[in-house]
Amino acid sequence: RGADVVIVDTAGRLHTQSNLMDELTKVRRVIAKQLPGAPHETLLSIDATTGQNGLRQAKIFAEAAEVDGVVLTKLDGTAKGGIVLAIADELQIPVKLIGTGEQLEDLRPFDPTDFANALLSEG
């Protein structure tokens, strides 16, 4: 009560568990009922190590929660996160943030040029 920002973390919800996806849809509906126009932003966090399964995961989450942006995490290892290109294209939603570590300062705005260069690099 009286909060300006509410963060709902749905970690652990697998897109293959329809009952959990149904709960997610209900949570969104309840939030919208409590505050007209809410939620104001819904971001899907995708692990950079996720392969082609990430596209299916994103489609199901987008259907359940009306996702309007992607956060690509775990870019601090060898994973390059190329699946995010298919997600952004297929679902027509932008990649908004990238995570390169575990601290707040490791979360930064997505830069398409930097991402393309890193994706195509051999390192």
What is the meaning of each model-derived region?
Residues 1-123:
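P-loop/Walker A NTP-binding module and the surrounding RecA-like catalytic core of P-loop NTPases
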